[in-house]
Amino acid sequence: MDKILEGLVSSSHPLPLKRVIVRKVVESAEHWLDEAQCEAMFDLTTRLILEGQDPFQRQVGHQVLEAYARYHRPEFESFFNKTFVLGLLHQGYHSLDRKDVAILDYIHNGLKLIMSCPSVLDLFSLLQVEVLRMVCERPEPQLCARLSDLLTDFVQCIPKGKLSITFCQQLVRTIGHFQCVSTQERELREYVSQVTKVSNLLQNIWKAEPATLLPSLQEVFASISSTDASFEPSVALASLVQHIPLQMITVLIRSLTTDPNVKDASMTQALCRMIDWLSWPLAQHVDTWVIALLKGLAAVQKFTILIDVTLLKIELVFNRLWFPLVRPGALAVLSHMLLSFQHSPEAFHLIVPHVVNLVHSFKNDGLPSSTAFLVQLTELIHCMMYHYSGFPDLYEPILEAIKDFPKPSEEKIKLILNQSAWTSQSNSLASCLSRLSGKSETGKTGLINLGNTCYMNSVIQALFMATDFRRQVLSLNLNGCNSLMKKLQHLFAFLAHTQREAYAPRIFFEASRPPWFTPRSQQDCSEYLRFLLDRLHEEEKILKVQASHKPSEILECSETSLQEVASKAAVLTETPRTSDGEKTLIEKMFGGKLRTHIRCLNCRSTSQKVEAFTDLSLAFCPSSSLENMSVQDPASSPSIQDGGLMQASVPGPSEEPVVYNPTTAAFICDSLVNEKTIGSPPNEFYCSENTSVPNESNKILVNKDVPQKPGGETTPSVTDLLNYFLAPEILTGDNQYYCENCASLQNAEKTMQITEEPEYLILTLLRFSYDQKYHVRRKILDNVSLPLVLELPVKRITSFSSLSESWSVDVDFTDLSENLAKKLKPSGTDEASCTKLVPYLLSSVVVHSGISSESGHYYSYARNITSTDSSYQMYHQSEALALASSQSHLLGRDSPSAVFEQDLENKEMSKEWFLFNDSRVTFTSFQSVQKITSRFPKDTAYVLLYKKQHSTNGLSGNNPTSGLWINGDPPLQKELMDAITKDNKLYLQEQELNARARALQAASASCSFRPNGFDDNDPPGSCGPTGGGGGGGFNTVGRLVF
């Protein structure tokens, strides 16, 4: 029968005839044949299968072999034995090479035919060894795929025990050697299919024998981390990623990133090659593992690797966005790489030139998937332009291309950036070693205490959080200038963009410290604030005068010129201001005008003067302040000095003698000639007589609507103190007024009225006083209620002819001295005026913790407030503008907008507040601000910043939407951006070195948690890095001196 079949397949008979005869041969297989005939038939069919010249011959061989093996199984079992199979695997078959896939297919088919025979067990044992040998020989993808098919069908052939681990490792190495040089789609598809079969085999082995998984993954890492330049592992290894359980991510990444045997060069290679895996079309979860490794490296602070890999691979990842199959994973990795690379715009700017073309291409195809992708990409681009807003020339084409897609809110952008930063990645393994010192979750930067410099830190943070002021400072062009404003701009830029948790403002401190301030000793923050604003103001005036004299020359501003501020200020202020355009930045932001009006009670003539102020110093009403004074000498008692004047803006310390006028009556602000009895109280207030001071009727104001303390005492509010500040005052006794009309000292009535309100209203609560009798400094510990919404009474002057004729309105920052009233000259005429209640929102609160100005600690609460707020559109509609009357400027609760104001306060209560405590910045709430003194009696509000609210933006050129102020802040100049980028790189290097040092010491060091950057490095003294409401946990005794 074998001779007939052999002659038939090689004959020239027609193919249909051959098929009929072959069918007859197959049907005859059920007839009896002796062993020799069967063996001859098996030899012939094997030759036809392996060496057939055409598909017909090979098909005939398969059909006949299958038929005769089924009916003559013992004979086929004897033929298909271990020796025969081993010969095929070692020598091949005649001219057929042993690595030919046909041989493996033949063995695969032979196993199916003898599956029920006992001898198959011997073949299984043989093949367990042989398949391991074959894999070690690095078979080509096609042969490896056929081997995978065989082992998938016959799992008994897979090596067992320790050999299974070796087999998996060798199979991983084999996949690492796969290559496909063809560019034809059909061949590429076939290659991907072959790789998929091999990876599926590994998955099955891992499931059956879990012990093989970890060694296999170690082999994967060994392959991709190899630094051998002669070998580049195949991207086909990406096919294995989808089979690794996601539950193992944490364990594996921690093992990789903390293994001291893994060198940086190897880790860099591994990460680069994993990013290359994004090109593998069918791989799943590659992006998940890549991002996990990126986060793991950030957690152990290996920033050098992250920087190198990001710059090397960011363009490749962006390029993968063009390919639909790998686009989702590529976008996820691109987003993480860009959002975490926050110390420099370098990575983002590598892809900026390619963004517009990509956006236009996807917009034109109109597919829903493309639109959804562009929405995600647009959000990413907005985040990056927000973070690096100093490059309008690069970003304008991108903004134009993505203008039709939604822009995320600023809050969302900040949240995304904060969560993505390298320094925000937690490391549970290192938790017992050190707290990561990256930016806090707030995204804000602290200021390092340089030695009792909390008075400066708290003020700087309050000014930085004054959004409009910060933006104006950052927008100034001060290149080539060494002025104090330039140093403030530099400090603001670092607070906004540094990666550090806290910044050390050494240069600014040395430049801004008043000469009389002793270094490393506690100072008064209010005094420092006044000095700082005055210095900035005078400096700008000098520059403007120099610019007017030398318009064609480039101004050089140096420290030496700044030292001449005091001497030149008087000369420069002789020129009166004529327009807002001539105002300095400090005048625009913090400058207001206060009119002092004095009326002689004898001749009824009046005199007045308008002066500028940068802050208002508010004294406490005598009744409450005398009851709750803190004294360094417990035996001393307060001494009341009568006849003093209230100061509006004081350049010196706020610990000047706080003197209260004992004859102050009710709150009446009437600049017109009023024939009524002076001191008649308005309906909502009453005055109680106090005869503790001889010959004076010391009247004390009590607001009926102020919250009551336990025991019936009232808690004064800032509104009350402001009312008290603006209340009329009778000048008598030693404080009599010299009337030029009467040519003698006379009793007089003095009133003060705000005629021009500032953008930012600074209020200082006069808590520190000097007792001249006992020679001790005292602090008033009264709790003061802080309203979120404050209405400032501003008296608009509609006719000022008489005033302008007799007095020029000088805008200089000098104090209203106590003898000012006696120097005022009579005006002779009255002017019409009307009062407008200007709404302000509480922006910042500087708190003093302690019992004396020479000790204790400062910290501040603050929040972001811009010039406009949607809720205040309605507010301005409810404002009433009325002519001045005897009670027009009272700030009581019965004002027309009181109900609406209360509603606004409720809305503002829920807004985000920050607690700035030197290096530490935390989230807090307004409730914490309100309750600080009740929780910590020695922690009291001291300096307040209120932001004026506009129905429309009143600051020209400060519109965040104008130009390209991506994040509301102006773009940083190149000089500042370069400095920040350089420092951020330095910071990352410092963190990495520290992390490596800790890792080396971890094995022998005891695990004791002591956060660095908190209070370890702070200098000794009365000022420390923590404390205060909202974050406090210290007891009262421990908070006196930190």
Swiss-Prot record:
Q: What are the USP domain coordinates in residue numbering? A: 445-949
Q: What is its main location?
A: cytoplasm
Keyword check for Cell wall biogenesis/degradation, yes or no. Answer: no
Q: Which domain of life is it from?
A: Eukaryota
Q: In which tissues is it expressed?
A: Highly expressed in skeletal muscle. Expressed in adrenal gland.
What does the function comment of this entry state?
Answer: Deubiquitinating enzyme that plays a role in various cellular processes, including DNA repair, cell cycle regulation, and immune response. Plays a role in the inhibition of type I interferon signaling by mediating the 'Lys-33' to 'Lys-48' ubiquitination transition of TBK1 leading to its degradation. Cleaves the ubiquitin chain from the histone demethylase LSD1/KDM1A and prevents it from degradation by the 26S proteasome, thus maintaining LSD1 protein level in cells. Plays a role in the DNA damage response by regulating the deacetylase activity of HDAC1.
Protein name per its UniProtKB record: Ubiquitin carboxyl-terminal hydrolase 38
The species is Homo sapiens
